[in-house]
Amino acid sequence: MLTDREIISTLEMLENENLDVRTVTLGINLFDCASHDPEIVKNKIFSRITHLAENLVPICDRIGEKYGIPVVNKRIAVSPIAVVGAALSSSQMVDIAKTLNAVAEEVNVDFIGGFSALVQKGIARGDRALIEAIPHALTATERVCASINVASTRAGINMDAVLLMGNTIKQAAKLTADKDGLACAKLCVFANIPQDIPFMAGAYLGIGEADAVINMGVSGPGVVKKAIDRALEANPDLDLGQISELIKKTSYKVTRVGELIGREVADNLKVPFGVVDLSLAPTPNVGDSVGEIFQSLGLRSIGVPGTTAALALLNDAVKKGGAFASSRVGGLSGAFIPVSEDLNISEAARKGYIGLDKLEAITSVCSVGLDMDAIPGDTSAETVAAIIADEMAIGVINNKTTAARLIPVPGKKAGDNAYFGGLLGQSTILPVNNGQDANRFIRHGGLIPAPIQSLTN
């Protein structure tokens, strides 16, 4: 039974601690839109999405107003376009991306994800056409997001796909050089990608999903920080086990709020409710930062020794509390460490507390460790691919999701600033070791085999 104090604390989260529903994402199956004729594909896609999503934004706004809980982003995720458009050329794939952007504008959603391909074991014709289309597609559109899965624990790491993505990222950055490589901010490379991610840029509707489904992403880093601050102010001698328990209880409340909104949106749209993603997602705003939680836990800054252990504690406690609150937990459900999107982490990078090496290390205990990382524009495609390969290896060996969202900023070097705007924020450009050197290891290509599962050390 809820106590008066628990109800009041939840109201305080809404009033003073930046608690919101970060995203309501409507997944839409587009497989029956496939055709050899690109005009048929485009018309079917536009018709299907407008039919299912025309009321998404007004329903989210109405329910958010009803409960006093803002739904910050309304988004759409579609079936992997590499499969839907398997018969199309790369130039036709660009046209499909423009159609997705047009329909996103029509129904007034913030982003539409699913310009995606799954190439962990091999690259089919449609996959290659889509990957080749990505630089021009993301340059020509504002709301389309792309994700490519290049590795899995069962298949290994497709190094041909990894190198291809290194070149793709470099080309996308070049085409948006006047915007500090902005196209790359809408492109994520994955290992073990889940099929029900509500967050961008990784969202797509998996092959095993329904025709339409609502997936939720809750927020709450500011809520967690304030809860820790209050508890330590009352009792500075709390041990880490007690702090973990506190975070768990806070996560429970946040998740219940998210599921309440998600289920009501799904009921109003007459589609099934899918999952709540428990990921702590920051914004560039003060008081809505994952990085600030580390300082509340007693670290000088994210990136100093103790960071990985603190993140492990935080991530695990959030999952435990969320899993108790809902039987429908999914997506990434692991903390994001997006350098440019988190004001505190961006400042830590500027001061030199955190760099690529530490960000890669903490990926072992979270889902997206190399996220929105600006790197020097002269970093070679092979080096970009090598960074991705390192990130994929952590996910494959540890049987977990990992992802990389790297932005080589044209014309800028380590220590300069990159500006992306809005929720994407800004960041100091991180140095890369031997960034311009050739990398023969990456050029070998092929498949790094799937790891043995019985010997896990």
What kind of feature is each model-predicted range?
Residues 1-457:
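Anaerobic metallocofactor- and corrinoid-dependent redox/one-carbon enzyme cores
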